[in-house]
Amino acid sequence: MKGCLATMDKELWIERANDSLVKHFYEQQSGIEQRDGFESKLTFGTAGIRGKFGLGEGRLNKFTIEKLALGLARYLNAQTNNPTIVIHYDIRHLSTEFAQIIANVLANHQITVYLPDTYKTTPELSFAVRNLNTAAGIMITASHNPKDYNGIKVYGSDGAQLSTDASELASRYIEEVGDPLQIDIPISKQNTSYIKPFPKSVTDDYMKHIQNMIGYIPKSDLQVVFTSLHGTSVPIVPELLQSLNFNQFNLVEAQCKPDPNFSSVQSANPEDHRAFDQAVELANKSHADLLISTDPDADRLGIAECDAHGHITYFNGNQIGALLLNYRIQQTSQLRHRLMIQSIVSSELTKSLARYNNVEYKEVLTGFKFIAQEIRQLDDHQNMIFAFEESYGFLSEPFVRDKDAVQIVPLIIKYASELKLYGKTLKDALEQIYQTVGRHEDTLFSHTLEGLEGKKKINAIMTKFRSNPPQEIQGLKVKAIEDYLTSEVYQLDKDTTSQINSPKSNVIRVLFDEGFIALRPSGTEPKIKLYVSLKCPNFDDVAQKINAMIFS
């Protein structure tokens, strides 16, 4: 009987394919991909919804977007009277159409919607929620995922992504909607009157906040190459740099045009060195010093340097974090009670740098919403000077409550310009940090373990560390094991257990005098990540051996 119902559901979806907005994507998919759309179901989690286009409840299409929007409308109306919301969207396939669908559904429920007539960045959405004092915000993006993906991120009234509790409540409202094929969305002129143009003044205010943060960029002969990887950071980043009287940059023209197919990049992820390929070519032609890329929704950023011989130095997320923290420490020397926030899988390097400079630091779970929660809880006398995650997400000043590559681009250019005046580079600055606090190094191993056997292996690895914690790993003596699922930390040398004041998450962190390793399974994919952050000789060899020991 279940198989018959599934077949009937599939037939109903195929009958509605012409109205789904995604027929073209569905027809290009393999049989397995098509079937997965009918046999799976999109779920609204702490990061919203993200998935492929296609037919069925397991795919993004007109009907699943209407279901999401209807659930969110009921959620918002239950939370506040006369709610308002701002919607932004990126350059991906169907982002504009999904934005209009969501706006129509919300308007149908007497929710005032601010909707721009062009694409915007994710940090602009966070800022707009705060600037317009709306009850919520919606960002339509799939960040750096492949071209056949999109997603919906939901933000609360503070401009941060929804908390875990709020996400769970919104999810219940969405699930209560039921079958997306049975939704009827009447549209009338009265309802569409709730949809308002997005005020240009908000973008102007956002630019002013960044201009005030930067002040000025010193005159030097620094040359920059910038690529938006076909995303949303053009035109806002070039306009911002010009407003700061910095014009010594060249755009990778082929990649600075919005393109939902990401035609000229192998990867639209600034973590991936391949994302810089065309930027490197242009840097060599233009004798540029600094290369900067932002991901498609402009919340994350990567950098590289080109020396006089054309040699490229790529910086990982932890190294960029250390450079930016170092610069912010220099900029804020007059402030007392300075604070830096980072995720629990980010580097020991930045913590050592903070300690050396008498800057307090806090560690939070992975996910920038946890950083935003810390910012919200700051005392009046505390000054948050920097926050970051090792996955290339940075925030300098909290007028935005999410990762913000747009505010970081001029900040890193200003730092590089100052260094250039003294004949120094960012690589030199990083080396100076190492000389000051020690050469803490970091790497990440990501393992995909498919199927039931893969799931069993991931569970076995986590269980082993929980039930039989090692005394040492590759000659490194274990001091403590932090288990964020049980919210406990076990001190091996003292044989004591204490509580961790943190939300629960399936993460284990093993602490040594030399640093830490962390294990973090994905909640949505058959993946597990191993983070290694150590100050030790032969780091690369030690990291490889730790990885082999755990996953052999």
Curated annotation (Swiss-Prot):
CDD domains, per the entry: PGM2 (cd05799)
Cofactor binding mode and count: Binds 1 Mg(2+) ion per subunit.
Source species, domain of life: Bacteria
GO molecular function, one term: magnesium ion binding
Active site: 143 (phosphoserine intermediate)
Cofactor (UniProt): Mg(2+)
Reactions catalysed: alpha-D-glucose 1-phosphate = alpha-D-glucose 6-phosphate
Binding-site residues for Mg(2+), renumbered to this chain: 143, 295, 297, 299
GO BP of this protein: enterobacterial common antigen biosynthetic process; glucose metabolic process; purine ribonucleoside salvage
EC number(s) recorded for this UniProt protein: 5.4.2.2
Keywords in alphabetical order: Carbohydrate metabolism, Glucose metabolism, Isomerase, Magnesium, Metal-binding, Phosphoprotein
Classification via Gene3D superfamilies: Alpha-D-Glucose-1,6-Bisphosphate, subunit A, domain 3, Alpha-D-phosphohexomutase, C-terminal domain
Keyword Isomerase (UniProt): yes
Pathway per the UniProt entry: Glycolipid metabolism; diglucosyl-diacylglycerol biosynthesis
Similarity section: Belongs to the phosphohexose mutase family.
PANTHER family, per database record: PHOSPHOGLUCOMUTASE 2B-RELATED, PHOSPHOMANNOMUTASE 45A
The protein's role, per its UniProt record: Catalyzes the interconversion between glucose-6-phosphate and alpha-glucose-1-phosphate. This is the first step in the biosynthesis of diglucosyl-diacylglycerol (Glc2-DAG), i.e. the predominant glycolipid found in the S.aureus membrane, which is also used as a membrane anchor for lipoteichoic acid (LTA).
Record-given protein name: Phosphoglucomutase
